[in-house]
Amino acid sequence: YEADWKNYYAGVYRCNELISREETIEWKETDSKRGTYMGECRTIRALLYFDMVRLWGNIPLFDEPVNENRPQAEPSEIFALIFDDLQYAIDNIPADAYPKANASSNDGHITRYAAEALFARAYLYYTGYYGTEPAGVTRAQALAAVEDIIAAGEYSLVSEYKNLWPAASAGVAEIGDMETLYGTYAGDGNSETVLAMKFTSSQDYNGNNDGNRWQVMVGMRSLDAAPYGRGWGGLTVNPAFVSEFKSGDTRRSASIIDLVGEGISSLPDFQNSYNDQREYT
């Protein structure tokens, strides 16, 4: 986790740099967006710390851009900053900053509703894991956050669970036939998306660039065709998990790649290279 540790704190440092310079920035015509930009920055910092405190527990806390070693802080101190940052975002990002109607093009941005969702999620985690309320934050605040999201009327479940993913939305489709696969896909920024983390497709096998490393780790070996992409073939599905799905449960085919049922195991590349993969991946 050394690389993750460094990358997380590099992100925190960048956020701290911007936050520390807020009063010296010549906002001019962008002054109306000042709260939005700073709210997004502070939400990113909160999200970074939320990940780190769950990964490592006691960690050094930096809320300013300094080059020094600091002792570990208690999780309660980390969460105090998390909630403070998210509350700032809730108070300063206008509800119409990034309209849901334009989500397909701006769904990497952080909205007020994304900050509210993270606020409620952090509250649930803290009370569930530590068995007490975080100092200065109440259940009423967390409830108000999610109720505001609901009241906005911009979010809802998609009609079919499988449509959340291109590969699952069309059922068994010709490998590489993206027109069919995207035919029923709910799309980027769909009605279920409150906060989207954007990735590029430029990741390589050495961990470089900014792509989705998760895909590199778990993607099927030897297959380059969309929608699966090539990977290391890790995290194959436990058969016991597969058997938990009852007959006719459509969530199974939406969640698990069936190498035989989807025709993957009969592809020449698969037969010639890695035909020892498990039935489900």
Where are the predicted features?
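Proline-centered turn/helix-capping motifs that create local helix->coil transitions or kinks
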Residues: 52-60, 154-159, 203
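Conserved, well-structured interaction surfaces
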Residues: 1-56, 66-80, 86-101, 281
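Short coil/turn linking the two alpha-helices of tandem helical-hairpin repeats
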Residues: 53-55, 60, 97, 122-134
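Structural register within alpha-helical repeat arrays
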Residues: 38, 45, 119-121, 126
